[in-house]
């Protein structure tokens, strides 16, 4: 009995552990599918999904990004290839391979229970997929248990299919119609790969092959819609482009729902070998782009000719083909037979908030919201400007917000002709907007007349709140410069608008608007003496016409100190929300340019959360770096040449000095020798030279054959001492 239980346990363990191969794990689609499957228990989709499980799964999917790198027991073990040898191994993968030979790859495939080949992202993978299914089919006789081969293809192999009902073009295609499908001209290789997989997949019991035709994939990092997300998020264009009339219907599916379909194929091993994976939506290109623009962009779209789509450098031919397809499809078998925990069953538009959240989290595009406060002349604006440039944030100053809001209201009130190609606003709504804008302008004018040109807090708070809730600030974030100044201003600005109870009890956490509340509060400060000295040293050109004039500055400084004495300061408000300010005493840093303060704030805030440098900015940075390098090299070369010239001059000077000293030494030696040779000369002239000269003269007169012998004989005979 015990042995049977042990055998059953082992069998269960074998069943519950499956090794899954997926190609190109470092790509968008394969990566998300692999991550999803690595968190799925083998066989889980065979059980019916209850409402409670769906709620739990929603919470689980939100935490998918932070999933543990450790392989969980009973889940699919993911292995696969990488597109680049230097790509990092995904955390969810047990093994990865790159630059591997076909022989070695086949050995790896034979170790797996499920082989998934994704041909939606790289046309180069089709030939390898056909080879893989062919090679595996030849090894069927050696299989110990059944293996599954899943080809992840695209609905573009249906793009030119004839309508099922000529009189009703809205009748969707289903899996049952796969024999009637006609491919887009650019996807003929895809449909050939599908046919090959279906051919091999029906030959053997131990080898089942499936084709899953997926719609345009979205979700997570954005997929093929990422270009539109990026354009909207950056906010650099007034309207998102729609290619053509935008009425073409695009079959779509969330990438995690596609992963759910694959999970069900693995668990259920269905009878149909061709499946369609699309959501229930019937969205047009215009619907999708308009939804993106409204929820994370300028809110407008602009229809442009299809030909202009090819000028968009970030869109590949493959992306354009998917975006311009006009095809209605229904995943009938998937909907009726599979248990899928849908992420976006109703489609892209209905789930845009969740999709946007995934997109921003996956790409690290969370906004950075900063509030910089402090006394006048402490350096708020200069520091805010530097931080805004570094983090690519919107620098918000009160005067600019007010001017912009009033200008916008005046533009609404002024007659506005609707241009050709723009969307017309309904007349009733337009009239209502004009009336509201005119009423608000009248109120602003009256308020400024009654307050000596100053605006009431109610208008300031309204304009500031609208600015902080604008799409650019929601996307990239903001740096709020010198506002709010008081506790009440902060409370009115950041508290929830729909708050029913106004409780003035301090010390409790008020409900605040998470959309606009700052993440970092920077409290700059310095002594009054330091601030006065800084203002005194400012150039007259900067001081003229600003609040830095002596009377206005002293009054502003006094007001700031007065409102920050009691326990109801603006800093207390943030403390109550547990957003503790970063206090920096600028006066103690002794840095006129505030570099140390900026460096300290960057350290506290962290790295930027954006797309980084654009191609143009990278090129500009590279150009500047090249110029700096050339200038540095030129300076180094000039310095080297100068150093060599100096060294050569010093060498010549030393040589000349040495020669001069040598000549001096020689002269001294000559003088010494001359001084030493005087007695010798005197001796020679007295005792030797007279006789020698006579002998030489005599030798010249006689001219003997041997003059030397003659001279010697002469000197011997005429030696004065001998005589």
Curated annotation (Swiss-Prot):
Record region (DPY-30): 679-723
Species this protein is from: Homo sapiens
Compartments (UniProt record): Cytoplasm, Cytosol; Cell projection, Cilium, Flagellum
Stated name of the protein: Adenylate kinase 7
Renumbered residue ranges of the record's region Adenylate kinase: 367-612
Family affiliation: In the central section; belongs to the adenylate kinase family.
Entry's disease: Spermatogenic failure 27: An autosomal recessive infertility disorder caused by spermatogenesis defects that result in multiple morphologic abnormalities of the sperm flagella, including short, irregular, coiled, or absent flagella.
Pfam families linked: ADK, Dpy-30
GO molecular function: (d)CMP kinase activity; adenylate kinase activity; ATP binding; nucleoside diphosphate kinase activity
Stretch list, region NMP: 397-455
Annotated gene: AK7
Major place of residence: cytoplasm
CDD domains tied to this protein: ADK (cd01428), DD_AK7 (cd22967)
Keyword Membrane in record: no
